[in-house]
């Protein structure tokens, strides 16, 4: 029963990871567009004495939900900043429980953020709130995108935490350590080679 449930959770997590990867790509392109928009506005002010008058608001929205949309991919690829000097020196049987505890705290934090994010969206919806720029964008639009990214992150933490709990009950400590532990130097080198378009193992 636990093995079948573990298989189902792994599939759900993989689906969430694929969605998170797409969201991360969208977030990356948003930052590019944001940089281009700011650059254009600066140059237009300098040489044409004109401004979009909405740069701050639009780029603020892009940065906010772009960051939220990158959370899932950062977690699954273990790209987030980690301070685990002590944890990495623990024996495996203790290390995996430390990883699980950290993930549990992350899930609680994700729930709180998702809960408060949708509360903000609901409040903006009830008051038909709009921004103060010339575009008067309904705040519920960018806020919903922002809350969606946080919610996807929370769902991923719950799926991972459930999967890790079952793995620990089955005694699969190595699998938990590979899932939640820091990336190895080999993994980081392979990622750098892949980004450079070089075959893995090339010097």
Task: Name the predicted role of every residue range.
Residues 1-203:
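Alpha-helical transmembrane segments and membrane-interface helix-loop junctions
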């Amino acid at each position: 029963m636990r093995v079948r449930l573990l298989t189902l959770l792994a599939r759900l997590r993989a689906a969430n990871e694929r969605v998170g990867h797409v969201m991360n790509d969208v977030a990356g392109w948003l930052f590019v567009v944001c940089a281009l928009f700011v650059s254009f506005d600066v140059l237009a002010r300098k040489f044409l004495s004109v401004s979009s008058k909405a740069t701050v608001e639009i780029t603020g929205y892009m940065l906010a939900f772009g960051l939220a949309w990158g959370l899932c991919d950062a977690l699954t690829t273990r790209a987030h900043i980690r301070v685990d000097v002590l944890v990495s020196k623990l024996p495996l049987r203790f290390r995996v429980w430390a990883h699980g505890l950290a993930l549990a705290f992350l899930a609680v934090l994700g729930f709180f953020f998702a809960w408060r994010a949708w509360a903000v969206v609901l409040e903006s919806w009830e008051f038909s709130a709009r921004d103060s720029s010339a575009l008067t964008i309904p705040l519920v639009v960018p806020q919903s995108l922002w809350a969606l990214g946080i919610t996807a992150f929370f769902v991923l933490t719950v799926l991972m935490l459930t999967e890790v709990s079952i793995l620990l009950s089955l005694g699969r400590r190595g699998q938990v350590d590979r899932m939640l532990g820091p990336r190895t130097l080999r993994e980081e080198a392979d990622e750098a080679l892949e980004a450079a378009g070089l075959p893995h193992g090339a010097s």
